[in-house]
């Protein structure tokens, strides 16, 4: 049963993160006037779909990943090329309204054509030999036209609705929006947790056994007001003061029953592993703070949690990239789907609150990782847009396609190696 719970939790967490990421791309793409033929949750065969305006929304069989198809983004080639035999339907202006790719359709009065030349990015036309007269004809593609395959309609984007023909700024926003929405999701989750759990105060809720606070006689209900020379008004002040005092003997003042008391103690040094490549040294008294529920403090506390988590993850990513050049790189620094599943299994056992917190950190991680300047990732494609903005011309299309393809192959190889490493570490 525990395996089933973990699998369901993994599917939900991974699905939410990818869906939010891809929705960010689509949201800004549509605002920029870029046509989005499909928004998919999951990968593989389609199991459910519905169309809203020009976008087909689909749920696919494999509950891992997802995507948004943007017209003219260079990631997909048109399904028609010279040498193919297709059928076309024409309007009264002799323009193509439907390009039919198979026999699963109900259209009548259509023409068969052997394609000799075609363009779906700039001039939008098909030129070929028609079956009815065996002559070569040139047909323009209507502004509102469709590919027809397996009974589904996929709209053909006019030139001004394609990603490639937009200016650099809307391109940048469209590409950056995926990571941005991951950051927004993480922030919302951190703030939501703060509202649910309350924000920590400097009042003691519980004292840990064999830690300095207990050994000094600090009890539940005591309010910490000073550590050394540092005044304490909220829980964050406790951490800041201890970071300065470190493990030196110091005086701690606290309020109990309206009276101020003081004790001398030595904070305990602890090491907390943050990621596979970084750890944090902290000094603690050994108490759990009481929480309070207010209207505005959770917003501030959630934002602080987001910044702290983002800083840790960003530092870990930078450290990982630096290790490639310093010779300290290890695949243990990376987690693929198998590694994430293993982590979810551990977090699920700690409860739903821990799972939400882990989801928030994972969302930050997904956003940051996607901004790494590797061609197949958002960060790499943003570099192409920056080049276009600086030099006032896009990167050569063939060069861009080749670079993205190499980047995609590189990412697939890395993912295979990371997945095998995760399987070896956790299950063999």
UniProtKB/Swiss-Prot annotation:
The active site is at 22. GO terms for molecular function: metal ion binding; metalloendopeptidase activity. It is found in: Cell membrane. InterPro entries: PDZ, PDZ_sf, Pept_M50_Zn, Peptidase_M50. Zn(2+) binds at residues 21, 25. One of its GO terms (cellular component) is plasma membrane. It comes from the Bacteria. SUPFAM superfamilies: PDZ domain-like (SSF50156). The chain crosses the membrane at residues 172-194, 309-331, 352-374, 401-420. GO terms for biological process: proteolysis. It is an enzyme of class 3 (hydrolase). Keywords: Cell membrane, Hydrolase, Membrane, Metal-binding, Metalloprotease, Protease, Transmembrane, Transmembrane helix, Zinc. Its cofactor is Zn(2+). The keyword Protease applies. It is a multi-pass membrane protein. Its EC number is 3.4.24.-. Disulfide bonds: none annotated. Residues 186-269 form the PDZ domain. Belongs to the peptidase M50B family. This is Putative zinc metalloprotease SAR1238. It comes from Staphylococcus aureus (strain MRSA252).
């Amino acid at each position: 049963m525990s395996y089933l719970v973990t699998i369901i939790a993994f599917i939900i967490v991974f699905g939410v993160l990818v869906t939010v990421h891809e929705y960010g791309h689509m949201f800004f793409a549509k605002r920029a006037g870029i046509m989005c033929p499909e928004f998919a949750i999951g990968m593989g065969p389609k199991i459910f779909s519905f169309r809203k305006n020009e976008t087909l929304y689909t749920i696919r069989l494999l509950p891992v990943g997802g995507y948004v198809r943007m017209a003219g983004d260079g990631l997909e080639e048109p399904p028609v090329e010279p040498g193919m035999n297709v059928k076309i339907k024409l309007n009264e202006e002799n323009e193509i309204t439907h390009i039919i790719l198979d026999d699963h359709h109900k259209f009548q009065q259509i023409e068969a054509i052997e394609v000799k030349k075609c363009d779906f990015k700039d001039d939008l036309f098909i030129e070929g030999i028609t079956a009815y007269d065996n002559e070569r004809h040139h047909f323009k593609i209507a502004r509102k036209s469709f590919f027809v395959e397996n009974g589904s309609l996929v709209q053909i984007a006019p030139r001004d609705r394609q990603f490639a023909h937009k200016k650099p700024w809307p391109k940048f926003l469209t590409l950056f929006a995926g990571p941005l929405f991951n950051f927004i999701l993480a922030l919302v989750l951190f703030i939501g947790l703060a509202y649910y759990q309350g924000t920590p105060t400097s009042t003691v809720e519980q004292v840990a056994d064999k830690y300095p606070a207990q050994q000094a006689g600090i009890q539940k209900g005591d309010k910490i007001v000073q550590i050394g020379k540092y005044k304490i008004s909220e829980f964050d002040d406790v951490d800041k003061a201890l970071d300065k005092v470190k493990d030196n003997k110091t005086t701690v003042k606290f309020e109990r029953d309206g009276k101020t008391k003081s004790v001398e103690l030595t904070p305990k040094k602890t090491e907390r592993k943050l990621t596979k490549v970084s750890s944090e040294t902290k000094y603690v008294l050994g108490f759990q703070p009481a929480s309070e529920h207010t209207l505005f403090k959770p917003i501030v506390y959630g934002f602080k949690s987001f910044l702290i988590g983002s800083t840790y993850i960003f530092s870990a990513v930078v450290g990982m990239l630096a290790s490639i050049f310093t010779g300290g790189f290890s695949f243990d620094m990376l987690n693929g789907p198998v590694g994430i599943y293993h982590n979810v299994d551990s977090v699920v056992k700690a409860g739903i609150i821990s799972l939400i917190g882990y989801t928030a950190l994972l969302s930050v991680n997904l956003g940051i990782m996607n901004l790494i300047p590797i061609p197949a990732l958002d960060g790499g494609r943003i570099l192409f847009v920056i080049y276009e903005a600086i030099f006032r011309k896009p990167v050569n299309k063939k060069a861009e396609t080749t670079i993205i393809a190499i980047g995609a192959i590189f990412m697939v190889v890395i993912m295979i190696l990371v997945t095998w490493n995760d399987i070896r570490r956790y299950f063999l």
